[in-house]
């Protein structure tokens, strides 16, 4: 059984590589791409509940379509890519993102596990750690809109099934400290700080409008504000629960303080 699964996975991987390299559409669209900053593509280190989806929508709208329609097409395809107007977009697929035939790509994958080609503008958006975890909890409680692509899994929603304290007991460290884990799977503050500092562009959820405007200027692209996956529900938490959460996410605050000391992340970057 194990060998059969590995054989199927290997065959699927080979088929993916063949399709990526033989389909001329994406290479044709991106062959001559050169953005204003000299890069050939943009890759987002996408941290959940930090406005990464909103940033993605700003790019997916460039072709003139409703960005939700573009996102739905990406999610419906095995290779998680599509085109819109003269632009190519890619998501999630490790090899596809490594190939580089897209204007904008993104994944939640840790940075150390995602190879990227040269001349890639790397972007990440950071958020106040307590606010991000609270937003993540509210998101699990409420779930996605019925027509939203990329629905959160029912198993993951169960993390928030019995209140905030139970959620803090259950949530795995990579989900609790997602910002740190994205840049260090060992959850090492120094390693994560160094990797974030190496990104081309870093800004915060709190300074999103300014960050998006600066990015649009840097790339010379007409990026406009698109809000997505904004959870309207705000769960009640006690001061004691907030204190507990602040203690649990202390490594992320330390990471943000180090970044701020180096002038990274913009003036709105929260440091605790």
Where are these regions (language model features)?
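Hydrophobic residues on the short alpha-helix immediately C-terminal to a glycine-rich phosphate/catalytic loop
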Residues: 58-59, 180-181, 259
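Membrane-proximal basic amphipathic "stem/tether" segments
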Residues: 1-41, 84-91
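PAPS-dependent sulfotransferase catalytic domain
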Residues: 29-30, 69, 76-125, 131-224
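Aromatic-acidic/polar surface patches that form glycan- and anion
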Residues: 37-38, 45-48, 115, 192, ...
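A residue-level signal for conserved active-site and pocket-lining positions in enzyme catalytic cores
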Residues: 51, 128, 200-203, 215, ...
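Short, solvent-exposed loop/turn segments at secondary-structure junctions
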Residues: 48-52, 62, 110-112, 128-132, ...
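PAPS-dependent sulfotransferase catalytic core
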Residues: 29, 106-109, 223-272
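N-terminal pre-catalytic "stem/leader" segment of glycosyltransferase-like enzymes
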Residues: 37-84
């Amino acid at each position: 059984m194990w060998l059969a699964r590995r054989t199927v996975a290997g065959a699927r991987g080979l088929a993916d590589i063949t399709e990526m390299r033989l389909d001329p559409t994406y290479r044709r669209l991106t062959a001559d791409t050169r953005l204003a900053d000299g890069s050939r593509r943009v890759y987002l280190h996408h941290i959940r509940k930090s406005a990464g989806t909103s940033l993605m929508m700003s790019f997916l709208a460039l072709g003139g379509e409703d960005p939700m329609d573009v996102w739905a097409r990406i999610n419906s395809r095995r290779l998680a890519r599509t085109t819109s107007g003269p632009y190519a977009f890619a998501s999630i697929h490790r090899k596809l993102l490594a190939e580089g035939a897209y204007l904008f790509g993104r994944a939640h994958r840790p940075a150390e596990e995602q190879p990227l080609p040269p001349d890639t503008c790397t972007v990440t958006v950071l958020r106040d750690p307590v606010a991000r975890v609270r937003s993540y909890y509210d998101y699990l409680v409420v779930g996605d809109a019925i027509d939203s692509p990329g629905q959160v899994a029912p198993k993951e929603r169960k993390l928030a099934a019995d209140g905030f304290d139970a959620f803090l007991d259950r949530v795995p460290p990579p989900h609790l400290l997602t910002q740190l884990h994205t840049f260090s799977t060992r959850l090492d503050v120094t390693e994560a700080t160094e990797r974030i500092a190496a990104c081309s562009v870093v800004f915060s959820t709190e300074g999103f409008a300014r960050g998006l405007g600066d990015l649009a200027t840097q790339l010379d692209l007409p990026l406009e504000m698109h809000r997505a996956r904004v959870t309207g529900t705000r769960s009640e938490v006690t001061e004691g629960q907030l204190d507990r959460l602040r203690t649990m996410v202390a490594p992320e605050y330390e990471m943000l303080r180090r970044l701020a000391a180096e002038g990274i992340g913009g003036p709105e970057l929260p440091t605790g």
